[in-house]
Amino acid sequence: MIPLQRPPLTDQLEAELARRTEAIRKAGPTTATGRAAWRTAREPKARLRTLLHRMTPGLLRCMYCGDNLGTDIDHFEPIARAPLRTFDWHNHLLACAYCNSNQKRDRFPTDPASGTPLLIDPATEDPADHLLLYLESGAYQGLTAKGHATIDVFALNSRAELVRGRRLAFTVVKALLRDWHTRTTAGDHATAAEIADALDLLWQADVVRAVYRLTDNRPLAEVVLGPEAFTALTALT
């Protein structure tokens, strides 16, 4: 999971979403009215999906697990809990079908004392404040209550394919960095530029970001990456 930038709505789309929200309010804001309104909103959903595609890490990856293709518009705060947020642009994220339908569903843990959400919203906060990714193992450690809840709801550590995918992605990133170093040293700057672009499009954007963050601790980065990959990383950041 990485931080994301939410683009603004057009005035036309913002007005359309507000109109549909008001219709839910007038009909009675229930789970049923919210879901019915969402099912029939084909054209606004298509435009929202286009905007969400602009936010996604890598090649249209799920904003939660980062591993699978983002196919579903997820309501961060579920319709069952907040029907009036059905058409709230700030409540929409792109999820894979598995995270949306099998893991999160209507789950939305909150702090029992304050009522604040305990899931990380990557569009409003930096997941690295709550999650630490161990690159060698591919596993996450929760640093806060939000981090622990997010790991639990999306099964970020208990889905073996996610952990293995992150671990293998780290191997790929190191190989690409070494190749970038080799190509640059040989004067093949065109291929080196393609490699740098490939790093930005890897399916596991959280792994790439965790590698870039190693520059905060350069002695550790050199040990973890090796000399050639470390040299490439320092040149690219």
What are these model-derived regions, one by one?
Residues R61-L94, Y98, Q103-L118:
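Histidine-centered nuclease catalytic patch
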Residues A18-R61, P83-T86, H90:
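Short, charged surface segments at domain edges that flank catalytic/cofactor-binding sites
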Residues M1-R42, A229-T237:
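General N-terminal leader/first-domain-start detector
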Residues R107-T110, S114-T184:
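Conserved, surface-exposed functional patches that form binding/active-site neighborhoods
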Residues F154-T237:
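C-terminal, charged low-complexity interaction regions
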